[in-house]
Every structure is written in C-alpha cells, then in structure tokens.
Amino acid sequence: MSDLTDIQEEITRHEQQLVVARQKLKDAERAVEVYPDDVIKNTLQARQQTVSALEDKLADYKRRMADAVSRKKMDTKPTDPTGIEPDDHLKERSSLRYGNVLDVNAIDIEEPSGQTADWYTIGVYVIGFTIPIILKALYMLSTRGRQTVKENKGTRIRFKDDTSFEDINGIRRPKHLYVSMPTAQSTMKAEELTPGRFRTIVCGLFPTQIQVRNIMSPVMGVIGFSFFVKDWPEKIREFMEKECPFIKPEVKPGTPAQEVEFLKRNRVYFMTRQDVLDKNHVADIDKLIDYAASGDPTSPDDIKSPNAPWVFACAPDRSPPTCIYVAGMAELGAFFSILQDMRNTIMASKTVGTAEEKLKRKSSFYQSYLRRTQSMGIQLDQRIILLYMLEWGKEMVDHFHLGDDMDPELRGLAQSLIDQKVKEISNQEPLKI
C-alpha cells in the first residue's frame, strides 16, 4: 500500500507544480506579445521546457500507478486450489507454471512489420535538420550507442542542439530530433525512426561528413575499418583491374588480346551487376535519391568514390537505401558484417567455457544484414561478397583487434618484474598480468 500512497503523493505534487508552471507559461506568452525581447523569449523557452518535463514525469507516474494497481489486483486474486487459472481451458494443471501477462493492446497488426520502413518519409524528416544535430545524434547512437540504448530503452527520446531550432511567430523554439528506442515487444510504425533506421539513413546520406569527423561504431573499429578505408581509391582501382573467376567471355576469332583481357576483369562483372540493379528500382527509394540529390547529402554514386566505404562506418544494420542501386555497395556492407561474425567467432573460440557458453558469444550480423537488405527489394550477389573476401579477407583478419595485442616477450618481461617486486614486499603469490 505504501507504494501506491507514495506514487499518489508524487502525482498530486506534480499536478500542483504543473498548474503553477502552466500559469507561468501563459504569463510569459503574454509578456512576449508585449515586449518581444531576447530575455523574455529565453524565459518563455525555459518555461516551455519546464512544462514539457513536468508533463512527461506526470505521465510516467500515472503509468506506474496503473502498473501498481494491476499488480495489486493480481496479488489479491483468490487462487484456485487446483492451481489452474479460472479462464484456462485445460482440465488438468500443466507441468509449466504461469508466467507474465503480455499486454498486446499497444500493438497494431495493420502496421508494417519491423523489416519494412518508409525510407522516403524518414529521409525527408532527417534532411530537414541541421548537419550538427544529425552527426551528434549519430555519435550518440553509434560510438556511444550501447550506453544510450541501455539508458533509454522503451522510450521515445529527443535530441536537442542549439543549431536546430524553428521560428514560430518570432519565437525561437528548439526543433527536437525524435528517435524511438524499442523493446522486443514494441511495434514500430513505417515512418518511425529507431537507432538502426537512423544509422542506416544518416550513413547513406552523409558519408563525407562522417569521414571528415571520423565517426565510427566500435564494432567497425575492432574489425580494422580504419585500416581498410586507408587509400580506398587505389585499393578499389586495383581490385577492379584483377581477373574475375566468374567471367568466361565468348571470344570471337581475331579479337585483340587486350580486349579479351579487359573482358575478364572484375570491372566488367560489376558493370553487369549494375545493369541488373538498374532494372529493379523501387519507386519510393528513387524518390528519396532524387530528393537527397537536391540538397546537402553526399551519397556515393559509384563504389570507387572516396567516401563509399564510409557509408558503413557506423555499422548500419542493412544497406542504406541511397546506395542500394550502386553495384557492389550492398555487398560491401555484407562483407563487413561477415567480418564482425568472424571476429566474434574468434573471440568465442579463445574464451574458457562450455561449448554452449561459447555458442552464445557468437553473432549473426550477416544473417540479419542479409534479411533486412533483401526486404528492401534487391537480392545480394554472393559472388561479389566472395570476391571481396578473396581479395581482402586475409589482411582484414590480420588487423582484427582481439583484446590481447601484447607481445609475448613483453608480457613475459612485465610478469617477471611483477613477480620480483611482489616477493620483495610480501609473501603473497603474484597475480598474472
């Protein structure tokens, strides 16, 4: 009962504070109409934020009150001596105990599934913000993504920055960037921004800005992404000139040897792939690409572009829609996702534990990337992924960060110094470094 009483007291207190705050807000709005100077406008903004914060807290307390009342009802409900719930259809008790009640009132099955997003609406929404707030939000959801998601799970957060504002009747108000942080039970609307969709759309729209500021997701850093993107134009040019094992050109008698050599190159295979992609466009994604081309975005139009690999710097969970019709781009993202799985498998293999515990440490980035990308309307070309792996797989594995990069000789020397010093100052057994 004390919990319910405490929550009710908090609700009453916040309602009183909200009444006062709303009255102060009305006073400030009237003052702005009479004396529209900066000081009074700033006061108005501060009072708007206070009212918004109090409304959020009050809504949270009311949710907690509803949950507490629901729990209390469940606790006081008389138990059936047979152990069977009154509305259970079983005639005899199951061997399983009763678990949680899953409330599905909030789920709308008419909405598209989580794999489907309205990329045009999402893209137009994001492009409507200033670059600083977009990149800062990207940093919070990629470089510091795990912490941000953990702290805000199950809520709809708002990013705020001084560069993002809108003028309404001469009053400068913050223009918040909204991102939903879903739980496993959440159903997302087609136009709703989630961390995965946000990283996907921003990486596809602003790779040059990401490259200049070196914004990178930790999961990309540990697979050696920094090494991979170094000298990218030269790297991809050399790759394109190499012989492709999947091409067997039909050579007519008298064809010059130089032309025959050219027809066997990876470049020709990529040209063929581009022809296939050009025939499989989706109208909404074409609209997004056209809209982005008229503004600030810097989406790559060729895999040889210097900023092309930076589309994947923040580990989007699928190929960004703005470059999905560029030959080799979606497959490059799949290559990175395989590298993430390879590194996690290596890390799981070197840890101590049972086979089951090791399996839990493995990941399925590739399967997730494949499923999400193909739901956007294209099939990935597995041969291109294989070409990437043959060309760069070995050197990328050699540049994995495996958390134990200390030289064996250095480790041995450091351990001997530790052992010696511990023996000098105590009779305890020295720990291993």
Curated annotation (Swiss-Prot):
Q: Locate the region Homomultimerization.
A: 1-79, 100-125, 377-425
- Enzyme group, top EC level? hydrolase
Which Gene Ontology molecular function entries are recorded, alphabetically?
A: endonuclease activity; RNA binding
Q: Where do the record's region annotations for Chaperone activity lie?
A: 1-100
Q: Name one GO cellular component term.
A: ribonucleoprotein complex
Q: Where is this region: Viral panhandle binding?
A: 1-175
Per the UniProt record, one Pfam family is Hanta_nucleocap
- In residue numbers, the region (Interaction with glycoprotein N) covers 80-248
Q: Give the top-rank taxon of the lineage listed in the UniProt record for this protein.
A: Viruses
Give the UniProt subcellular location, in the record's own words. Virion; Host cytoplasm, Host perinuclear region; Host Golgi apparatus, Host cis-Golgi network
Q: Where is this site: Important for the endonuclease activity?
A: D88, D103
Where in this protein does the record put region Disordered? Answer: 69-89
**Which residue ranges are recorded for the region named Interaction with host UBE2I/UBC9?**
188-191
E.C. code: 3.1.-.-
Q: Which UniProt keywords apply?
A: Capsid protein, Chaperone, Coiled coil, Endonuclease, Helical capsid protein, Host cytoplasm, Host Golgi apparatus, Hydrolase, Nuclease, Ribonucleoprotein, RNA-binding, Viral nucleoprotein, Virion
Q: Which parts of this chain are annotated as the region Viral RNA-binding?
A: 175-217
Q: Which segments show compositional bias classed as Basic and acidic residues?
A: 69-78
Specify where the region named Interaction with host DAXX lies, as residue ranges.
377-433
According to the record, the residues making up region (RdRP binding) are 1-50
Coiled-coil-forming residues are 4-71
Q: What does this protein do?
A: Encapsidates the genome protecting it from nucleases. The encapsidated genomic RNA is termed the nucleocapsid (NC) and serves as template for transcription and replication. The nucleocapsid has a left-handed helical structure. As a trimer, specifically binds and acts as a chaperone to unwind the panhandle structure formed by the viral RNA (vRNA) termini. Involved in the transcription and replication initiation of vRNA by mediating primer annealing. Plays a role in cap snatching by sequestering capped RNAs in P bodies for use by the viral RdRp during transcription initiation.
Q: How does it assemble?
A: Homotrimer. Homomultimer. Homomultimerizes and binds to viral genomic RNA to form the nucleocapsid. Interacts with host MAP1LC3B; this interaction participates to the protection of Gn from virus-triggered autophagy. Interacts with host SNAP29; this interaction participates to the protection of glycoprotein N from virus-triggered autophagy. Interacts (via N-terminus) with host RPS19; this interaction probably mediates the loading of the 40S ribosomal subunit on viral capped mRNA during N-mediated translation initiation. Interacts with the viral RdRp. Interacts with host SUMO1 (via N-terminus).
Q: What is known of its domains?
A: The N-terminus is required for chaperone activity and, in trimeric form, this region likely serves in high affinity vRNA panhandle recognition. The N-terminus also contains a coiled coil region, which probably participates in but is insufficient to initiate N trimerization. The YxxL motif is indispensable for the interaction with host MAP1LC3B. The central region is involved in specific RNA-binding. Has distinct cap- and RNA-binding sites so it can bind simultaneously both the vRNA and mRNA cap.
Name of the protein described by the UniProt record: Nucleoprotein
What gene makes this protein? N
